[in-house]
């Protein structure tokens, strides 16, 4: 169950980053175009905001790591990558959605799609971590229980 949910949420989050996030004038802008513009204009030159803007293109890679690790039964890696990517996308989408709008600049539906899918990715990753920890503790409680195989960890 968790590999499917994490994969779908990660794919939706990555897909949402390519949807229109902002409309400026007559043009829709994706998250990548928006952050490239912020960087070019010097609004995100230093500090945590600068790092957040520059590391944004790595989000699809981290989402792919979360999905692949989940299918491989590596729930700690998957949960960490999924929760990190989900929280990162969720935070940035909330900032863009909460920004003041003008008659020339306003947010589009892609930012809401990304916000929702990132929330699902974060929740699925945290639930996967909780399930993995529960199974880990249960395995330690019964010393006679055989070691799990990669196939048995997929649910």
Predicted regions and their residues:
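Compact integral membrane and secretory-pathway proteins
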Residues: 1-155
């Amino acid at each position: 169950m968790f590999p499917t949910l994490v994969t779908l949420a990660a794919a939706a989050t990555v897909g949402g980053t390519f949807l229109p996030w902002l409309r400026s004038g007559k043009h829709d802008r994706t998250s990548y175009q928006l952050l490239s513009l912020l960087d070019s204009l010097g609004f995100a030159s230093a500090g945590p905001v600068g790092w957040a803007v520059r590391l944004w293109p790595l989000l699809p890679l981290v989402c792919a790591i979360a999905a692949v690790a989940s299918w491989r039964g590596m729930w700690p890696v998957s949960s960490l990558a999924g929760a990190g990517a989900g929280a990162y996308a969720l935070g940035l989408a909330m900032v863009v959605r909460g920004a003041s709008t003008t008659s020339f600049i306003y947010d589009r539906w892609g930012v809401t799609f990304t916000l929702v899918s990132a929330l699902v990715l974060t929740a699925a990753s945290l639930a996967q971590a909780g399930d993995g920890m529960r199974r880990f503790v249960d395995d330690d409680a019964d010393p006679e229980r055989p070691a799990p195989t990669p196939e048995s960890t997929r649910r």
